[in-house]
């Protein structure tokens, strides 16, 4: 889905828990907004959804909002860390949906993305995990420019 996109940004915001028995600081729900541009357009598009914990705190189920309410997906945090200099990163696995194949995403808090050596180290680590090693080889970089 992202190969034809650029300037992808994902913003997660805590939502009130689904139950009053869950402390607010341990909420089981996130507001999830993705903005992006196509490679050849200045228009910014958005996808809005809600993530809800799916079992463990590392697994989430996403449900679209608006016309995407029919869409859903499952994703899991595989790892996270911080580069020298403070650029935080996270790696997620997402399951196949009606619209996308299964895959792996690398997230970077910094707009500049991850250093090549960080990307290679993460890929090496993923190559040792049987369930995701094939997907690790298909990771690609998303274009970032001054458009968004």
Language model: regions and residue ranges:
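A beta-rich soluble binding module of mature secreted/lumenal proteins
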Residues: 1-148
């Amino acid at each position: 889905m992202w190969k034809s996109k650029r300037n992808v940004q994902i913003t997660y915001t805590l939502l009130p828990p689904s139950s009053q028995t869950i402390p607010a600081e341990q909420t089981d729900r996130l507001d999830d907004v993705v903005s992006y541009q196509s490679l050849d357009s200045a228009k910014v598009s958005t996808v809005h959804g809600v993530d809800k914990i799916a079992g463990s705190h590392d697994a989430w189920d996403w449900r679209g909002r608006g016309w995407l309410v029919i869409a859903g997906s499952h994703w899991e945090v595989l790892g996270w860390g911080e580069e020298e200099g403070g650029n935080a990163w996270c790696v997620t696995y997402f399951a196949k949906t009606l619209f996308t194949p299964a895959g792996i995403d690398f997230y970077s808090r910094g707009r500049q993305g991850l250093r090549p050596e960080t990307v290679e180290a993460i890929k090496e680590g993923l190559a040792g995990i049987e369930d995701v090693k094939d997907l690790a080889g298909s990771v690609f970089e998303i274009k970032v420019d001054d458009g968004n």
